[in-house]
């Protein structure tokens, strides 16, 4: 587990700078542009500004359905896991917001050093360009998981209390569970569920809650495709299911979709096809956990749903800030 650490400058900034924005309805375009500018430099914003930004994000996300309806063209991105400088590399190769429409398939946080900056930047971009930045929920957008895999600890280090973590986890509950592009490409973080035959069944789930330990909502965020598997199998993850080619074919036919696009699993080549190109895994965290040596990928779908993959490597060392190895806060928090 790669625990997040903060540099002294960011810690001081987060605790000392006075906020400039009030309630979410007063969060102006200027405020959002200022937040985006700071976060693009991997600098923290003040705690009160986090609260306001999260409230604004919840307002926007609350208006979106469980299955986000998205028009092409769009660029699909897999797991990011707090690898901020690699997210900057993704935007470099994929194009800046709002020039490019993005759909991120969840797992924004945990394991990487900069989950706070990564998630807040994506939220600020969502608040500023709500129709250009689409975010759905991954299995790591969970209170329980983030207390184990780094995001909670990072919030405590960088802000000195759990308030920012609480604000962010409240946003998690409002994230959509899936998306469908032009009615033909079904997108989800993990995979399918034996409890779900149609997208309409996803649309009626009460998503505004912590990720359950089992059931359809859990399955969407945790399941994996399994080559050679027939029907459904128990997942070694302890949540969700393994689903085979037959389950994928049945779902696609019932919902008139051509492709199931998901993330959730490390792919050394950045993307991987399953089941005669009915299911696709996209992975967007290069050199995962700063040691796996994998490349990353994003998938661009044009107006006709033609596919173009862009492969990219981890950001060069000179482009990334080195987090402090042992911040003094470690001894006191």
UniProtKB/Swiss-Prot annotation:
Residues 7-27 have a biased composition (Polar residues). The gene is pph-4.1. Methylation at the C-terminal Leu-333 is critical for interactions with regulatory subunits. Serine/threonine-protein phosphatase 4 (PP4) occurs in different assemblies of the catalytic and one or more regulatory subunits. The regulatory subunits are likely to be ppfr-1, ppfr-2, ppfr-4 and smk-1. Interacts with mei-1. This is Serine/threonine-protein phosphatase 4 catalytic subunit 1. Its main location: cytoplasm. Pfam families: Metallophos (PF00149). Residues 1-29 are annotated as: Disordered. The modification Leucine methyl ester is found at residue 333. Protein phosphatase which plays an essential role in meiosis and in early embryonic mitosis. During spermatocyte meiosis and the first embryonic mitosis, regulates centrosome maturation, and thus spindle formation, by recruiting some of the components of the pericentriolar material (PCM). During oocyte meiosis I, regulates meiotic chromosome dynamics including synapsis-independent chromosome pairing, restriction of synapsis to homologous chromosomes, programmed DNA double-strand break initiation and crossover formation resulting in chiasma formation. The active site is at 140 (proton donor). The lineage of its organism: Eukaryota, Metazoa, Ecdysozoa, Nematoda, Chromadorea. Mn(2+) 2 binds at residues 107, 139, 189, 264. It catalyses: O-phospho-L-seryl-[protein] + H2O = L-seryl-[protein] + phosphate; O-phospho-L-threonyl-[protein] + H2O = L-threonyl-[protein] + phosphate. Its cofactor is Mn(2+). It comes from the Eukaryota. Keywords: Cell cycle, Cell division, Cytoplasm, Cytoskeleton, Hydrolase, Manganese, Meiosis, Metal-binding, Methylation, Mitosis, Protein phosphatase. Its EC number is 3.1.3.16. InterPro entries: Calcineurin-like_PHP_ApaH (IPR004843), Metallo-depent_PP-like (IPR029052), PPA2-like (IPR047129), Ser/Thr-sp_prot-phosphatase (IPR006186). The keyword Repeat does not apply.
